[in-house]
């Protein structure tokens, strides 16, 4: 790790390497291209820091500002962005082709709750033994789930067979 660049990779004051910089004042006004030392002196005179805003520009763009305040605002923006992120989980419900009505209703209630919470839901019909011959029963159950949740969900992934299972994915309809 290089010592002249701080952890957050924003150069300030003496860490700026360029001889000349395009300077932006504390209120956002353009001060033109001046030498780095003059810019640092100007910033120190105002009790502020010279912060490199755009290092790739030619000459680099630097701004006179309070570095501590700038760093604090960047941290707040990062926290706010992190807060707005939503983690979508995939919940799975497993049923069998011989699932009775009451059990189906219970599973349906769970699927509806998952979708209301904003999670995607994978519905899996798994077959045992010779049940695999009756894939049509599994497809009927999956179609019934789609029909019973059409007010909350859209079909995200069509029913597909994988080994001894039939699977489909339901995604919640975005709320307006």
From Swiss-Prot:
Localization of this protein: Cytoplasm
Keywords of the record: Cytoplasm, Initiation factor, Protein biosynthesis
Superkingdom, taxonomy of origin: Bacteria
InterPro entries in UniProt: T_IF-3_C_sf, T_IF-3_N_sf, Translation_initiation_fac3_CS, Translation_initiation_fac_3, Translation_initiation_fac_3_C, Translation_initiation_fac_3_N
Pfam families, A to Z: IF3_C, IF3_N
GO molecular function (one): translation initiation factor activity
GO biological process, one term: ribosome disassembly
Principal location listed in the UniProt entry: cytoplasm
GO cellular component: cytosol; membrane
Entry-linked PANTHER family: TRANSLATION INITIATION FACTOR IF-3, TRANSLATION INITIATION FACTOR IF-3, MITOCHONDRIAL
Subunit structure of this chain's protein: Monomer.
Function: IF-3 binds to the 30S ribosomal subunit and shifts the equilibrium between 70S ribosomes and their 50S and 30S subunits in favor of the free subunits, thus enhancing the availability of 30S subunits on which protein synthesis initiation begins.
Family: Belongs to the IF-3 family.
Record-given protein name: Translation initiation factor IF-3
